[in-house]
């Protein structure tokens, strides 16, 4: 029989084709979700009142700051006004940079003025050339500031890098300086937040993973992408069968707020993973959806959280619309119910500097309503 001779090369060719397809897929450049390719709205010329704010002094000192929960017990749920003021003073230049980059990139994507692009890039290159935020001397609050800052800047920069208007085409030297700096910071963030015991893995680790995911796409580094996905899976497997995060339940009266605060980085990571062919929604039997549903139910009626940990919930933070910016990526991953969509539309646009600015512009541009909303992310 001649059949086996015919089958053998056919199987071999199939294997070769399969391996070539795998190699092509493996080497495909990392990309953000679709909305990040949006072009600049208008290329405005002529008179303008844009002023580039003074660039804050690059922070090159050790990353050791007081915690705003200083003196609180293990629950870390009681703010210390004195230490919070000290923390905000010490980190002012860092948060000024975060907010500034996010704000100016949003303005540039709206107006397209060269001065705005110059401003945003100068802010980042100034800090990059100073090796800012790279200190190996840090405490928990310090390494937290590093990952927040990286996430804020890299996710704003995504808008420039992937826009169909190609604003960085003639700014490659600046781009290389900025991206090399982001890459170094991401390596340090991975080091800062790796190999923690499960009882220490909470929203901070999720935000660290978001900063690394955003930087992975900016720098096209699959190793960073894989680390962020791995951290997401750890987070997903912390969500219990009822949608609670046990480590955030420890935050007593702030448990619901911290569950809500855990959602933005997780929803963004899942959205970015999806854009690159990795579906994280099934992880731990749909953990992200379970967590989102639990938080949305808790916002409507916080009694379930109070019953679960014995504490009446502090709803102060949950009255701020930008705290629900996670609904943009979340409702792109899942079919949100009509009442959730109605609530989302009432709160839009969602502008939060820790996620790179205006997420409504990226995920739901038909519901963009101009300048409504504070670029809040604190």
Swiss-Prot record:
It comes from Pseudomonas syringae pv. tomato (strain ATCC BAA-871 / DC3000). Belongs to the polysaccharide lyase 5 family. Pfam families: Alginate_lyase (PF05426). This is Alginate lyase. InterPro entries: Alginate_lyase, Alginate_lyase_dom, Chondroitin_lyas. Its main location: periplasm. Catalyzes the depolymerization of alginate by cleaving the beta-1,4 glycosidic bond between two adjacent sugar residues via a beta-elimination mechanism. May serve to degrade mislocalized alginate that is trapped in the periplasmic space. It is found in: Periplasm. The gene is algL.
């Amino acid at each position: 029989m001649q059949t086996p001779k015919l089958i053998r090369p056919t199987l071999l060719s199939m294997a070769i084709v399969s391996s070539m397809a795998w190699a092509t897929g493996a080497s495909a450049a990392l990309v953000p979700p679709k909305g990040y390719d949006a072009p600049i709205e208008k290329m405005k010329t002529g008179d303008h009142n844009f002023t580039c704010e003074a660039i804050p002094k690059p922070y090159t000192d050790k990353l050791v700051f007081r915690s705003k929960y200083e003196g609180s017990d293990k629950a870390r749920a009681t703010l210390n006004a004195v230490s919070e003021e000290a923390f905000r003073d010490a980190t002012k230049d860092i948060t000024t940079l975060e907010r500034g980059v996010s704000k100016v990139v949003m303005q540039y994507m709206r107006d397209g003025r060269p001065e705005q692009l110059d401003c945003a890039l100068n802010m980042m290159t100034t800090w990059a050339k100073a090796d800012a935020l790279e200190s190996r001397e840090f405490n928990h609050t310090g390494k937290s500031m590093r990952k927040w800052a990286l996430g804020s800047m890299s996710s704003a920069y995504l808008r420039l890098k992937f826009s169909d208007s190609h604003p960085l085409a003639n700014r490659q030297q600046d781009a290389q300086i900025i991206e090399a700096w982001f890459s170094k910071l991401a390596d340090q963030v991975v080091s800062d937040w790796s190999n923690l015991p499960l009882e220490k893995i909470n929203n901070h680790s999720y935000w660290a993973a978001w900063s690394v995911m955003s930087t992975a796409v900016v720098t096209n580094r699959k190793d960073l992408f894989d680390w962020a996905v791995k951290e997401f899976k750890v987070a997903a497997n912390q969500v219990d069968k009822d949608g609670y995060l046990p480590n955030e339940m420890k935050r007593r009266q702030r448990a619901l707020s911290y569950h809500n605060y855990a959602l933005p980085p997780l929803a963004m990571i899942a959205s970015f993973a999806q854009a690159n062919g990795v579906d994280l929604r099934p992880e731990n039997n749909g953990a992200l959806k379970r967590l989102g549903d639990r938080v949305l139910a808790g916002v409507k009626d916080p009694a379930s959280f109070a019953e679960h940990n014995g504490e009446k919930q502090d709803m102060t933070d949950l009255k701020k619309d930008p705290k629900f910016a996670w609904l943009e990526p979340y409702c792109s991953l899942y079919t949100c119910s009509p009442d959730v969509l109605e609530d989302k539309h009432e709160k839009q646009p969602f502008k939060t500097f820790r996620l790179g600015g205006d997420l409504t512009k990226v995920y739901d541009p038909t519901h963009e309503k101009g300048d409504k909303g504070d670029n809040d992310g604190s």
